[in-house]
Amino acid sequence: MKTIIINKPGEVEIIEQAMPVRKQGEALLKILYGGICGSDLGTYRGTFAYASYPRIPGHEFSAEIIEIDDNDRNLKPGMIVTCNPYFNCGHCYSCQRGLVNCCTSNETMGAQRDGAFSEYITMPIERIYDGKGLSAKTLALIEPFCISYHGISRANIQPNDKVLVIGAGTIGVLAAVAAKAKGAKVYISDVAENKMNYAIETFGLDGGILNDSPENFIKRVEEITNGNYFDVTIEAVGLPSTFQACIDAAAFGARMIQIGVGKRTHEFDFTLLQKKELNVYGSRNALKKDFLELIDLVKSGKVDLEKIVTNTYNLDEADKAFQDFSKNAASMLKVVIKF
């Protein structure tokens, strides 16, 4: 079978591997679509905090069940599914409290362990979710939506909250979509105006703030909020400058959610946290309930996830997909590979 591998930063190769052999309690899956996550792109660029090499990327995917044992989840061969790619130990303090997304030994596919970008993989049955008739392309987008949705849930967003999402990549846009679904007034900010405007127009967001300078950014924040700033700010980039922007744009008593993953350290005036009495939340991975709730939400027709896909490549074009995405990240929103 064919497998995509990142040998080192900037080097993607398609290699031949033996078919995986499933163990008891696992299913054999045929991968149908895989989305290139920002962390996969970071691994390709050498900027992802958890990257090691060589690495098979991919944790956003859909698949067809080829072989599976009898199970109590009603999963059968031929079903189109998606999966939870965050492997937890089940024994640490976090896992014991049900916070499996915060497992101290977490291994996410494509990051701490090899990912799904092969023609076939095996997967523990308990990590497989029935796609309920959603298309294979849509199901490959459920996992990034879960990342955003989990972060939004941390903020306890209320109807008419003023929300600012910084970062118009996949996670940021889907965070905006999730906040909008909760009745909030949602604005998005980015340095790439075309990408920002695409998100606003495609998903009916309330507006945008071009982050071309700190001064212009704050001026627009004040104009939009009548000087009151935002009830919720969401960092979906992973840079020190955008973290600072979230703090600066937050109202007194606001909630700030950190979803973006970065590699850099940052010095900032921490007294702003005290002065504004900010509630700052980290958000990591997602939970089973996020997957189940979002599959149902998308199935209801309230959200069209496929609108986020701007580019689709075939498996044999994997190297080109990574090259193009790396060079054109300012204009390419979600890139998927058809297997």
Q: Can you describe what each PLM-predicted range is?
A:
Residues 89-166:
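NAD(P)H dinucleotide-binding glycine-rich loop of Rossmann-like/cofactor-binding domains
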Residues 255, 268-307:
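Rossmann-fold dehydrogenase core element
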Residues 244-248, 288-339:
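C-terminal hydrophobic helical "lid"/dimerization subdomain
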Residues 134-213:
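Mid-domain Rossmann-like dinucleotide-binding core that forms the NAD(H)/NADP(H) cofactor-binding site
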Residues 201-279:
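Glycine-rich cofactor phosphate-binding loops and adjacent beta1-alpha1 units
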Residues 20-34, 47-93, 132-134:
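Glycine-rich beta-strand-centered segment in the early N-terminal region that forms part
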